[in-house]
Amino acid sequence: MKKIVISSLCLLSATMVFAENMKEASIVNANDTSRVIDLDEVVVVAQPKEGVRLRQQPMSSSAFGMQDMQTLQVKSLGQLADYVPSFVMPQYGSRLTSSMYIRGIGSRLNNSSVGLYYDHIPLMSKSAFNTHFYQLDRVDVLRGPQGTLYGGNSEGGIVRIYSKNPMNYQGTDVSLGLGMGLGYGRKAEVAHYHRPSDKLAFMVAGFYNSEDGFFNNTNLNEKNDKIDEAGAKVRLMWKPTAKLTFDLTSDYQYTIQNGFPYGAYDADKDETADPSTTFMNTYRRQMVNTGLTVSYDLNSYLLTSTTSHQYLWDRMKMDQDYVPTDYLSLQQTQKMNAVTEEIVFRSKNASRWQHATGIFGSYQWLHIDAPVGFGQGMTDMLDAMMQRVLPATHQMTFANFRVPGDFRTPQMNAAVFHESNLHLSDRLMATLGLRFEHHQIKNDYLTTALADITMTMTIPGRPAPTVMNIPYESKFESSVKKTSNQLLPKFGLTYRLCEDGSNIYAVVSKGYLAGGYNFQGFSDIFQMEMRSLGANFPRDGKVQHTADDQAQKDQQISYDAETTWNYEAGTHLNLFDHKVKADVAFFYTQIRNQQISRMSADYGFGRVIDNAGKSYSCGVEAALRGQAFDNHLMWGATYSFTHAKFKEYDDYDNARNLISYKDNYVPFIPQHQFSVNGDYRFDVEDDILSSITLGFNVKGQGKTYWEANNDMYQKFYATLGAHMMFKLNKVEVDFWGRNLTNTNYHTFLVNSQMTNQSFAHQGNPLHAGVDLRMHF
């Protein structure tokens, strides 16, 4: 941290010296008129559900335009999260891992508790969240439950991403990038926008990204985090009349990468080794998201329909023990198709009553094939385990042990909602909303434990041992269904303090995260079953299960819906004649049946979701941004404190002893987060060079606990970044550096009960590069 402060001061000093010596630089006007304008006023995007600007609503939010993201050197949603209070999207594992946490609420597996909308399309699979978003116009992050307008799985908040509108933006964009040193990478992106008439506009775009990776697998002598990805996007907008608009978009992406570079962590030395696995962990993904938005202007009202089809196929191959000895492997393939439809009718005039009413429906088909394989290290453990319960005259050995699993989990959602903003006076606005949501998930599964067993029996009096080859088989097959109905209300008050738009607000809202079924825990279930059979192992190797056995397993893999009540008060302030924007919020959230991701209890064969009884989260968020010196200086700062603890949560250890996690911190939630950034532009009177921009950013977070027992944690850390941009006629050349202090930190840590070790994903070390952007 001390290095970061010193580096920041040096950078600021250099900036001031450079400014003093720049004879061609603009002279600062003593009567500076820099004003920070709400992004809603500058980057106007279609809003089917909302007629009130973000900072006039009773909620905490952050909005970023294209220029903001370039200034902050943001290339992904995870990097953007560093500049949003209470929001974290740790970058670890692979493109598959896309967990998002807001205000202590998040989910590592299955459904997300933070929703993601891309050009009005609600992305249905969390596996599609960690992707390459490009040609963006604006990104909004809405914090706190957004259930009234956006439904279940938005209890933490909503991220809304908007790409550039070809009706408003024309020309060709070319972006090239080169990463230097560690993690050497290349990127290319091209987009063309054309508007042949007032009624028709379109865009076509494509990209390619490649990174060599930072972490070398010492057992395989290959980078464990290299990635190649490419994609293309088209968008077509047609306005046959002044009132009717069709907006069609389709985005295809392909990813191939080495992933999950988890190295052994030594807590005593606070050191993490490079990854070393039996085989290379890999991830492949293809996805296509297509959406059609049709809007009709009814003068005082707006009618909007958004229809989408989403396709995702991916395959993950993982060495789940993370060591060179072959214990356990998982090859998971999933295929998802989803369709969504939403129709919204809202007012668009400036009357005292502004309202939105809508219906939503979705259906998702998901097929997961997840065979688990047991290597020699695991079969040796099984042999020893069985030998402890068998007579000395018997010996049992396992070979070719595997657990194939086939899971089909269709989901259906249906909802109706309404939200009103009532202007009770010139200064006071009441927000009232209610949503009824029906959710249903089904799980048709077939999973079997298979192995080739050799039983050797030495019988006194016989000249040779008796050898029996037994084909082991234990099967569970079932079809289960879970249904829930939820009412999601919202009550808010907003009071305008003065004519500049500053206001205070208070809001109460409910959110929920749908329940579901685990599929990674069956390997643990079969191991427990085998241990309990012991000497009663069936002679023919076929384990029979009763109806009660099956019902018990159905219950064992099930987890319930999570619900939250959020209480929040805050303010949106426009200070010093709009030169500074300040947003502050205080929140308290009650959580029931919180869904906690943990390793399977006995052997740690995969992660499962469990329900904690009760927990809570409270904290404060603050964000400042401003401009000065005739808009030459742009700066921002954020801070958040999140206190998330269990009130009731009991579990069992390996010895089946009851453990209480009451008053322990909820894992994966940073207690503190902050960011500071600044950019200063020096104007140059030159025929070729028009300006030079120097910028820096500092961001940090911690303490973050990794497990519910709070034994392991990431202490608070911070990283420093900087960039220098040269703006030519139609070209921008931007030199950048990240983690310039080479801070050591972890983005993820997992404990393996199989090997009694901890494994961590290290944060990226110091790296730098250059970007070239052209528009013509």
Task: Give short role names for the model-derived ranges.
Residues 112, 125, 134-137, 143, ...:
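Outer-membrane beta-barrel translocator/receptor signature
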Residues 293-318, 503-507, 520, 526-610, ...:
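Membrane-embedded beta-barrel scaffold of Gram-negative outer-membrane proteins
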Residues 356, 426-430, 579-591, 608-707, ...:
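Gram-negative outer-membrane beta-barrel transporters
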Residues 216-222, 260-276, 321-328, 371-404, ...:
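Solvent-exposed loop segments that connect transmembrane elements
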Residues 512, 699-707, 725-776:
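C-terminal beta-signal and adjacent terminal beta-strands/loops
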Residues 168-170, 177, 191-279, 312-325, ...:
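Periplasmic-side early beta-strands and strand-to-turn transitions of outer-membrane beta-barrels
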Residues 32-43, 52-98, 105-119, 129-143, ...:
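Periplasmic N-terminal gating module of Gram-negative TonB-dependent outer-membrane receptors
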Residues 239, 244-251, 286-314, 330-453, ...:
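Face-selective signature of the C-terminal outer-membrane beta-barrel domain
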